[in-house]
Amino acid sequence: MSLHENHATLATAQAGAHSQWRARLELGFVREGERTTLKHRLHDGPLRVQRPLYPEGYGVCHAVIVHPPGGIAGGDQLAIDVDVGAGAHAVIATPGATKWYKSNGRAAQQCVGVRVGAGGKLDWLPQNNIVFDQANAKLDFSLMLGDGATALGWDATQLGRQAAGERWSEGSLHAVSRIVGADGELLWFERASLAANDSLREAAQGLDGFSAYGTLWAVGAACDDALAEALTAQLGFDESIRAAASCVTSGVLVVRAVSRSMEMLQKALTRCWVQLRPVVHGVQGVPLRIWAT
């Protein structure tokens, strides 16, 4: 499996600066008969995976990634590498929101790389990001798919601690997401670069004043314009939430949403996932138990 940094570099960083964390987590899922097994796990620093669960039967392995510090501060660097082998099906989630703390001028970074082998299936379902005031966050997500692999996933972000009445008035957010097909073709690429004082936050062609936004992506042969239109017809478009689906290329569907409430946005994305899962993976969409805790 690919490594973002070697052990010596990580150890030196942690020993030399206790105020920042560098952490890496590797996960490898394989298909063994009728069972998907978490065969490989390796961690450095404060990233862990809980004991694998099988609420859908042994063919689908659920793994929950935890970050014990509870948030990502300035200077922190987190790297997550996931390999889902041929024919395996992995569901990967987090137990709570990822908090991006005040950075004191230093950027915090999270890099995620996921590979899904031929005929494999992935559900990438982390809970949302919360960007604190004065946070400077960098996020990088890459998904590489083998022949016949299918994938469903999302990413959602709340700017400012809305529940605490805090606005995101200073800081920056840079995010890159890419999905690459079996032949190396770039299926979807998105780059977002946003400063707290950026006029796009209020502009109609930007966030239009909404503080929460998210994207759900689906990759599979069934993802087409008709499916996108059917989803859009069921999504809200008013002063509380605005959402729509589109087929960005053959076999790739994207749902985008903005909302004044992260709870409302997450519910909308969850409904989409429940509807899409049987179509994309051929598996019933049942909300994860961890979402109810």
From Swiss-Prot:
Cellular compartment(s): Cytoplasm
Q: Molecular function (GO) terms listed?
A: nickel cation binding
Q: What protein does this entry describe?
A: Urease accessory protein UreD
* Record family assignment: Belongs to the UreD family.
The UniProt keywords, alphabetically, are:
Chaperone, Cytoplasm, Nickel insertion
Cross-referenced Pfam families, in alphabetical order? UreD
Q: Which superkingdom does the taxonomy of this entry point to?
A: Bacteria
Native species of this protein? Paraburkholderia xenovorans (strain LB400)
